[in-house]
């Protein structure tokens, strides 16, 4: 899960958009939500 969250952070740094297709990434998206991240 931590690795998936790191991938989400990399995606956030590049596209500033966290693509949450997996439940683990959805949790990461909620955490990154404080950084104004739109969760698709």
UniProtKB/Swiss-Prot annotation:
Disulfide bonds: none annotated. The keyword Glycoprotein applies. GO terms for molecular function: chitin binding. The keyword Glycoprotein applies. GO terms for biological process: defense response to fungus. N-glycosylated. Keywords: Chitin-binding, Glycoprotein. Chitin-binding protein. Has antifungal activity against C.krusei, C.albicans, C.tropicalis and C.parapsilosis. Has antinociceptive and anti-inflammatory activity in mice. This is Chitin-binding protein 4. It comes from Moringa oleifera. The lineage of its organism: Eukaryota, Viridiplantae, Streptophyta, Embryophyta, Tracheophyta.
